[in-house]
Design a protein with these regions (language model features):
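Auxiliary Fe-S-binding modules of radical SAM enzymes
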Residues: 1-22, 28-31, 75, 198, ...
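N-terminal [4Fe-4S]-dependent radical SAM core
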Residues: 2-51, 55-66
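Conserved Radical SAM active-site core
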Residues: 29-31, 36-41, 59-156, 161-180, ...
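Hydrophobic faces of well-ordered beta-strands that scaffold small-molecule active sites
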Residues: 41-43, 88, 120-122, 143-145, ...
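Short, solvent-exposed polar/charged micro-motifs at secondary-structure junctions
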Residues: 41-44, 132-133, 262-267
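Short, small-residue-rich loop/turn micro-motifs
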Residues: 47-49, 147-149, 217-219
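Short beta->alpha linker loops
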Residues: 49, 69, 126-127, 280-283
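Short, flexible active-site loops
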Residues: 180-189, 219-227
């Protein structure tokens, strides 16, 4: 049984947010457990619509997001929710080029950042030089960027004519910018198999400014072309070990997108002492305790 031990306070650019330390008899090492949920909702600027409809998603995940399709409505939402939630993820469906159409929300996000306590995490899709310009003007607290390390995956899963080099160039643009950002890698994205993930890690190793590396795992989702895909679990675990060997572990987070039945991935992240896990199982929290770790709860997105 785990009990709330005491409340600490974590500070971020957008204001003061609470962190709960669970069952902490001695300060050994903290592992963060993230519960974004209602305190950190996801917003789609395109509603349920997506022009791209990648094979792993097919716009299904947009159906669970709050549809806010105009800057004015976004500001209204922020005013109404200020003080009630920690912040929100701003995302949406992609254009045929693989971009989330966020530019028209530049002033709205800037206003929210400057006038409310809400933390804003923006999920961009692929970005170029012109996107960096408006994103720096927008000035969100954080950018979440999905890194694709295989051109075959870009073509066959996402369905764009881009290449892995375009994604690596986008990382370089983010690293040279004034923006806080966290790369995300979807393990098993190529129809359940590991393909370009190792190259993505090697690229990230060369960067200087990223906050966290968020590792997630493909969920074979009903209603998508990948609903019957079988994950190469052994290959995914090997990749996670490679990531943990090559990236600072206190920057690696196991993100929310992953099959909940894949318990081994949670146990590995605890054993290897990564920074945190989003919504861990009770068995995983118990393992943290057995490993002498303190579990610190954050009701927000795992990039923070």
């Amino acid at each position: 049984v785990f009990y709330l031990f005491y409340h600490a306070t974590a500070f971020h650019d957008g204001g003061r947010k609470s962190t709960t330390i669970i069952n902490s008899p001695a300060f050994t090492k903290i592992m963060y457990i993230y519960y974004p949920g209602a305190k950190f909702p996801s917003i789609s600027v395109t509603g349920p619509h997506c022009a791209l409809r990648c094979k792993h998603c097919n716009a299904k995940y947009l159906q669970h997001m709050i549809p806010i399709t105009t800057p004015e409505k976004l500001v209204e939402f922020a005013k109404e929710q200020d003080g009630k939630i920690s912040g929100f993820l701003l995302s949406g469906g992609s254009t045929l080029e693989g971009k989330v159409p966020l530019k028209r929300f530049t002033r709205a996000v800037r206003w929210i950042v400057e006038n409310t306590s809400l933390i804003v995490n923006v999920h961009t899709g692929i970005i170029d030089e012109i996107d960096i310009e408006y994103l720096e003007e927008m000035h969100p607290h954080h950018i979440s960027f999905d890194v694709i390390g295989s051109t075959s995956t870009v073509h066959e899963v996402l369905g764009t004519k881009r290449s892995k080099e375009d994604y690596f160039h986008a990382l370089e643009l983010l690293d040279r910018s004034t923006l806080n950002y966290s790369p995300h890698i979807i393990a098993g994205l190529h129809f359940g198999k590991v393909l370009g993930e190792y190259d993505a890690i090697d690229k990230i190793k060369s960067l200087n400014r990223y906050s966290n590396l968020v590792l997630i795992v493909l969920i074979p989702t009903k209603g998508t072309p990948m609903e019957n895909v079988k994950l190469d679990k052994e290959g995914i675990l090997e990749f996670f070990n490679y990531a943990l060997d090559n990236i600072e572990r206190d920057k690696i987070v196991l993100g929310c997108m992953r099959p909940r039945s894949f318990h081994e991935i949670e146990y590995l992240c605890v054993k290897r002492r990564c920074k945190g896990i989003v919504i861990p199982s009770l068995k995983t929290i118990k393992l943290m305790h057995e490993e002498g770790l303190d579990a610190a709860r954050k009701d927000m997105c795992c990039v923070f």
